[in-house]
Amino acid sequence: RGAGFTICDVQPVVEVTGRVIQTRAVPAGAGVGYGWAVTAAEGMRLATIGVGYADGWPRQLSAVGGAAFEGRLLPFVGRISMDSLVVDVSALPPDALKPGDHVELLGPNRTPEQLALDGATIDYEVIARLGRRLCREYVS
């Protein structure tokens, strides 16, 4: 964090979560993402999340970084698609993440600064790119 954050008690004001659309097991050799950008070296459990680059999620984060769930980082797998992205949930217990659950894409565990480093950009761009398709909830 920049110097301004160390002298003020500034709290994060933005959190982005993505809803799990589906989970599935994929065997070794299966392709994942647009053009099968990734081939599973071994069997994996994957979750498709309903956020993509049309929502302002940076494509530069394809295969770097990840989402957070219950304190664990779930690595992105393959390319960020227009309407979805995929995370590896193999490290979670089999029924820990189900369709309808939410993962943290931006928030206390995945800060704008971290996303900017992963995506070779700046934290202001991460926030500015967030699109109108994302549901907004204002809290006091």
Question: Where on the chain are the PLM-derived regions?
Answer:
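Active-site anion/phosphate-binding pocket segments in diverse small-molecule metabolic enzymes
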Residues: 1-140
